[in-house]
Amino acid sequence: MPILGLAPELYPTKPAHFDIEKVIRPNILALHPYRCARDDYSEGILLDANENALGHSIPSASSSALEPELQPTLSLDLHRYPSPTHDPIKQRLAELRGVSGPESIFLGVGSDEVLDLLIRVCVAPGTEKILITPPTYGMYSVCAQVNDVGVVKVPLELSGDAGEGGERGRFSLRVDEVKKAISEDPSIKLIFLCSPGNPTGTLIPLSSIREILEYEDFKGIVIVDEAYIDFADEEASAVSLLKDYANLCVTQTLSKSFGLAAIRLGIAFAHPSLIQILMNTKAPYNISTPTAALAQSALSPDAVALMKQKVSTLVASRASLLRGLEALAPLGLGPAIGGNTANFVMVPVLAKDGSGAPDNVRAGKIYKTLAESEGVVVRFRGNEAGCAGCLRITIGSEDENKVVLQKFSELLKAL
């Protein structure tokens, strides 16, 4: 069954063992997407969408009720539904990330909408599954449960004794175990890989991703979540593989390196066939006009240059924070574990008896005291696989990092 809205002859697919029409749920393939006149006509006297022709009702700039900083937003056409496609944003993203064009890009309300939509279009409730590699981002399992699909777990390398990736191989992807799980369970439709990992901070080598993409027993799609990719080396992104693999989808966001978490803009880069399916299935007008305006500005050459400058500053701060945390080793703070390619670090709190064992109870006390008494909120990750006793610390400003180190020193002595 052809994908509505796609000219397949323009977009050949490979590898040979992949057929997207066998991955997408039949009811989604047959879906006739919601369409409106605005899809075809966006100028002139617009009387097609039952909008308020008199405009919004927020008081004018002369009113004391108006916050001055809202004026740029209020000057937008807020009484009109936003663009269904946002091609100018996609074009800037295509140029930034080196993909073919807007036809290879989907925009969602944060990456979470993208992840949820991928599950909904590919995985049949009650009968089919996704595969995840703990410890990893928690929303994969949440989306799976919401959509009533199964979850197969293949933990990352937890011993730290072998494999590529983080410290001494810790949190490496166990490719052979992933392939084994695929071969044993053909109901697995999607594989979610987080690179750099959350909470691990570890990159998955492109060679490992390629090995799974080329594994003929797997007929589904590999999703590489790259929320933190700008904090890693430029050549680390799996976007470079898209031209060769129609069974790959790479997700990114403006929340991390771009510093725009509040606008909720997530991105999927994939073969045009999958992008068209997502476009056919998404809610109409999912990206708001204010979000689109801010995203367009954030992707300008000057803004991208500033983003890269701030990323460089954060990377330097990450190194400084790590040195400060290492100095706390005599107080019972273990060396950072995992990789060093995100805007956070993860450190284990060790038992006070000097045994060197990670201590979840002590870590929990420090976490809670930091938040409730010291005004410093970090993330307790001690219940994740391979993360016993661990606290995840986002890289803050220089002043914030100094406070974190001081408070950690005080609490490690006291607790």
Write out the residue ranges for each language-model feature.
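Conserved PLP-binding catalytic core of the aspartate aminotransferase-like
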Residues: 315, 328-373, 395-397
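PLP-dependent aminotransferase class I/II
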Residues: 247-330, 336-337
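Short acidic/glycine-enriched loop/turn segments that link adjacent beta-strands
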Residues: 262, 341-342, 385-389
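Conserved core of the PLP fold type I
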Residues: 76-217, 228-245, 249
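PLP-dependent enzyme catalytic core of the Aspartate aminotransferase-like
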Residues: 207, 359, 372-373, 383-415
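N-terminal "arm"/small-domain region of PLP-dependent enzymes with the aminotransferase-like
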Residues: 2-85, 173, 187
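Short beta-strand
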Residues: 251, 335-340, 380-383
